[in-house]
Amino acid sequence: MDRNSVTGLALIALIMIVWLQFMSPEKKPLQQVTDAGKARTEQVAAEINSDMQPAAVPATEDSFGMFAPAASGTERLTVIDNDLFHAVVSSKGATLKSLVLKKHLDGNLKPFDLVSDAKNGALSMLFLTREGRRIDTRDLYFAGSSLDTLHTIKGKETYALSYRLALSPRQSIEVSYTFTGDSYRIGYDVKLTGLSGSLAGNEYQVQWDGGLPYTEKNRDDEARSAQASAYLGGSLVKLDAEKDGRSYREEQSGDARWVAVRNKYFIAALIPEDRTAGFYLDGQKERGNAYENYLASLKMEVPASEEVVDSRFSLYLGPLDYNTVKAQHADIEKIMDFGWDWLTRPFAEFVILPAFTWMNRFVSNYGLIIIIFAFLIKLVTYPLSTASTKSMKKMAALQPMLKELQDKYKDNPAKLQSELGRIYKEAGVNPLGGCLPVVLQMPLLFAMFYVFRSSIQLRQHGFLWVKDLSVPDSILDFGFTIPMYGSHIALLPILMAVTVFLQQKITPTAQSNDQMKIMLYMFPAMMLLFFNNMPSGLALYYLMFNVFSVAQQFYINSTSSAADLPQVSISAPSRPKKKKSGSGK
């Protein structure tokens, strides 16, 4: 490995480490998850029922105005059980009060609820009356049919749940949910009658109020992914409440494709099927806590000339699985962070994820898929890396000659560069050739970092001693943090650093002995620092790629001969003298 190659690799590793600093097990059987989900749903329902009053104290006209008659009533709960979740919907607010996923567990392998506020719920409408009253439908009691029941649906079966709030004979609010047996997507339709002259600004908002609960053990890491977002005009708008005690807000006008609240692996996205007037995002981080609370809402117009306004929405509430959200045809996948749109995102979307999805049809273990993927990438880069290795061997053979040239022409830089160029050309070597394969792989490596860091495919999938390929494979936790290294020892990065050391040891180098000794230890150490906090899936990929590279290097070393080395000399070939032409015989 020549000086340019080593310098390039060192700079790349240093950039990766600095960038990281400033950026930041077996599954239970499905039946167990299902039973646990039902238990959690029943618990939520019991908690809500225990707080219910047969009739609330009548609300005053001053607080609710025209909505006062609906501010008291009896809360009734409906449970929906489909293939993917258990949901609880309440007649108070016609809101979703609980949704427990069946196929996903939290970091402690326990079921979790995607609705953080089981008492008030999350999905609602917000009105501002012309008198200045702020009305949240979660404070109002709706009527409906088939309430206080459990509905089970499978596959393509659907179930519609309807609520109605009558304010007067000519004024009402209707809300309808549509559930499908095999989908995380829930239909949410709103019909307003006779309200066009009663609302300030002739608009209302449909909102998801509440951050998604954190599901992973590393709350600080999850906080880096938590956010409220909107997609408008082909651009992603993010709201990140990163500082304690500070309120964050973002509001824009226009036709929004969706608004959403997410944590690291799950999302609640509101998708309008009609044109919107804009969106509003709000967020705040709790003091002394990594948890970030968010609100995301869509602004909808209520034209003064229309007596009845129908608006249709969908709520996607489930995992941030690329293939699943892509299939919604709503651009929700744009919220997934795959790095630079012009470089790493294409590698993630069109190379890594499709390859993993295809291989997963035949291989169920993602550890094996990563190893196969590393082997395939090695095959693709084999011709380039072989040519690079041979070029480095030639460079190593030329070092004595190059040193002699440097001494000979130390006072004539122009002549030195000319002679170096001639020798490189005659020997058929490229001084930068040793660094080229690594540089070409960097977009792929960075893309894999983003995929392994944020994709739910690897979450809670193990391999050998690794319990979860989406997090570091810690074998020892310190209980404190070492700067640049972390709070634990991960085994895969150590093995990977050993392979980096071995690869450098057997690779020809154009460095001096002192340079070689420094880089022989410094570069593996830098890679160890970088990968110790990386997802173990990424460390496994790089480990296996290095193993294949070491095997390739052994093969090249064993099949090379002296005839492969360049045959050049320091002195340039002398030019033949021109024969003087005579004027006579």
UniProtKB/Swiss-Prot annotation:
Q: Where in the cell is it found?
A: Cell inner membrane
- A GO MF term: membrane insertase activity
Signal peptide range: none
What are the entry keywords?
Answer: Cell inner membrane, Cell membrane, Chaperone, Membrane, Protein transport, Transmembrane, Transmembrane helix, Transport
Q: What is its main location?
A: membrane
Topology with respect to the bilayer: Multi-pass membrane protein
Bilayer-spanning residue ranges: 5-25, 338-358, 362-382, 432-452, 482-502, 518-538
- Look up the record and give one Gene Ontology term from the biological process aspect: protein transport
Q: What cystine linkages occur within this chain? A: none
GO CC term (a single one): plasma membrane
Q: What is the annotated role of this protein in its UniProt record? A: Required for the insertion and/or proper folding and/or complex formation of integral membrane proteins into the membrane. Involved in integration of membrane proteins that insert both dependently and independently of the Sec translocase complex, as well as at least some lipoproteins. Aids folding of multispanning membrane proteins.
Record text on subunit structure and interactions: Interacts with the Sec translocase complex via SecD. Specifically interacts with transmembrane segments of nascent integral membrane proteins during membrane integration.
Q: Which family does it belong to?
A: Belongs to the OXA1/ALB3/YidC family. Type 1 subfamily.
Q: What is this protein called?
A: Membrane protein insertase YidC
Lineage in the entry? Bacteria, Pseudomonadati, Chlorobiota, Chlorobiia, Chlorobiales
